[in-house]
Amino acid sequence: MMSLLLIPVTFITVAYFYQNKGMTDKKKIATFFEITKVCVQHKGELQYPIFIKEVEDDISINYVYKLPLGIPSQLIKKLAEVLEEGLYKPVKISFQQRELYIRVFKQQIPERWNWSKDLLKEHTWNVMIGKALDKHIYHDFEKTPHMCVSGMTRFGKTVFLKNIMTSLILQQPQHVKFHIIDLKEGLEFSPYKDLSQVVEVAENPEQALEMLVRVREKMVNQIEIMKKSYFNNIVDTSIKERCFIIVDEGANLCPTQGLPKKQRDLLYICQEMLSEIARIGGGLGFRLIFCTQYPTADTLPRQIKQNSDAKLGFRLPTAVASQVALDESGLEELPSLPGRALFKTDRTEEIQVPYLKDKDMWDLLKQYKVVKQHEASNPQTESKANRDFIHFE
């Protein structure tokens, strides 16, 4: 009868490898299997993974093993972290049927790297997110329209937002429009309000509400246009314009109990409108990027989180906060490096976000500066926008 032998504590493996620094990675892995009992016992005999081959490329060596019958997938998934401790190198593990692939990387994720125009994918909505161990990570806003961004202050959230804004403008200068809610009193994004692609920048909750009323009116109009053409998703139409609603520091829209009722009501309406964009805006060409410093059930509304299939998390202080941001722990374990993050879609990747200086951003975008007439909100937009809900009939 087969029985699974349990993995002992990691530090035993680390101590052993420390005493045997001259060993090759291949020998260390074989020894690791023995020390940690990554094996099955069958008829009194221990059966370990059998080495098949190794394949080397520029950035890694892939060790391929044949797994003995009976090792469960849960055990294999735990190997990467323990192997990294023993090899002192980044490791990725995958398995298919009974073959185990242990990919050992030669270098770590860079601690810092700079954004460049070479990263652009012209005439697409596919933008650079960051660099992982083995590849550049891009995100296609046509496939996944909404994104939540979380992380402590000074760890790269606003730099990331500016990266996205710069890439989208340079890739789609004629078709991208931005509605930006900068709740740091406009400190970060008001310098860009005169770009032709920036419709408006709201600097406080009152201005945010006025902006969202106008965005809602645009959504209502888009619904009418698409209903007449019998379309329900903008990617199936010839409409090229996409509207990005960026919220920098969404916690300032949280209707906390200590505020006056009028202010709480205003903030609640803002959150409801943003939730509505997240629910139905994707198919209409509206993309929400919602950013908050410390995610909680109040500061990251449930509808926004559930409808944002792309989630980017920079370092957070606790596993609880990481669970709120990504539905998994890990952000609390990231190194204290600005720009280091976890990006989650159908899988989770550790990445380093490229760095873009404000001066370099302006040098790239100043060609799109135009003379604008900044006006107060237009009360005529209230007719359709003030309905309680937007819905398809």
Locate predicted features:
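Short, glycine/acidic-rich hinge or "gate" loops at secondary-structure transitions
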Residues: 227-236
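Short polybasic amphipathic segments
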Residues: 127-129, 339-345
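Interdomain "pre-motor" coupling segment immediately N-terminal to P-loop NTPase/helicase cores
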Residues: 68-113
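Short edge beta-strands and adjacent turn/loop segments
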Residues: 38-62, 242
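N-proximal, solvent-exposed amphipathic alpha-helical segments enriched in charged/polar residues
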Residues: 11-48
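N-terminal, intrinsically disordered, polar/charged segments of Gram-positive cell-envelope systems
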Residues: 31-34, 376-389
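P-loop NTPase catalytic phosphate-binding loop
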Residues: 2-24, 59-64, 68, 97, ...
